[in-house]
């Protein structure tokens, strides 16, 4: 709906028929990128859906102390998710190698600036907020959180369209992939395609996290053959089951 209103408004401003303006919406053009930025919803906050972070710190991260863990945040918006992951890994003595991508260039620009207001914080995940400063991920100044730019030595930020039907080429394999709060934009066919592509970029035994509201709607026919839906208590995720069993599998 937002996208349609944007197209109608811009067609009127340019005095073009609706169909003619639509012809201008070609990928990799300014018009198309502006449409994407207008149509995407970017509500996010630090340590959103805290159960995922609790699971990581109780079940996975203790086994990775002193080791590198590769994580892809595939719909990172303005950066709260990958920053949360970075801080948690640092807190547990894990070497973070994080790739963060999103389709919205405006949100990625906000991420790179690294200035966050109170709206990036929620009661959900509140107990983790203190580690943002404890790990020197950033500092709280004048009711804002200011990101330490050194974080970008460990977080690579890229613009990437999950619906583009191609594999991300900016990393090899990830141990953990976060694809949360993005499947609401996709139909089942696209969800299946995205999960298949993500599975190809996942190391054996690796995990994919969807949002709590999304993973319950993922039927077995959408899950790649190389993956299975697994739960640890009330926390559900997808696990890559082929290949040599990794530390991730052995700890669950």
Where is each model-derived feature located?
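A structural alpha-helix within SAM-dependent methyltransferase catalytic domains
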Residues: 57, 61, 86-90, 199
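Conserved SAM-binding loop of SAM-dependent methyltransferases across substrates and taxa
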Residues: 78-92
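Extended basic-aromatic, gly/pro-enriched interface segments that bind polyanionic ligands
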Residues: 97-178, 182-186, 190, 216, ...
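Core SAM-dependent methyltransferase catalytic element
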Residues: 176, 225-252
């Amino acid at each position: 709906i937002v996208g349609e209103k944007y197209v109608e408004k811009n067609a009127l401003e340019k005095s073009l028929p609706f169909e003619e303006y639509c012809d201008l919406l070609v990928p990799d053009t300014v018009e198309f990128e502006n449409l994407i930025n207008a149509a995407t919803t970017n509500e996010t906050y630090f340590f959103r859906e805290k159960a995922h972070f609790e699971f990581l710190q109780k079940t996975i991260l203790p086994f990775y102390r002193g080791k590198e863990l590769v994580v892809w945040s595939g719909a990172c918006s303005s950066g709260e998710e990958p920053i949360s992951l970075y801080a948690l890994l640092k807190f547990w003595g894990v070497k973070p190698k994080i790739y963060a991508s999103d389709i919205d260039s405006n949100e990625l620009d906000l991420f790179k600036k690294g200035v966050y207001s109170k709206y990036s914080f929620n009661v959900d995940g509140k107990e983790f907020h203190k580690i943002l400063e404890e790990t020197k991920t950033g500092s709280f100044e004048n009711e804002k959180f200011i990101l330490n730019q050194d974080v970008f030595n460990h977080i690579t930020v890229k613009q990437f369209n999950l619906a583009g039907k191609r594999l991300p080429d900016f990393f090899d394999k990830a141990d953990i992939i976060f694809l949360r709060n993005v499947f609401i934009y996709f139909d089942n066919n696209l969800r299946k395609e995205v999960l298949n592509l993500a599975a190809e970029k996942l190391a054996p035994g690796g995990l994919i996290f969807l949002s709590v509201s999304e993973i319950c709607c993922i039927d077995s026919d959408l899950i790649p053959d190389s993956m299975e839906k697994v739960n640890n208590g009330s926390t559900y995720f997808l696990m890559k089951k082929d290949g040599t069993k990794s530390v991730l599998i052995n700890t669950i």
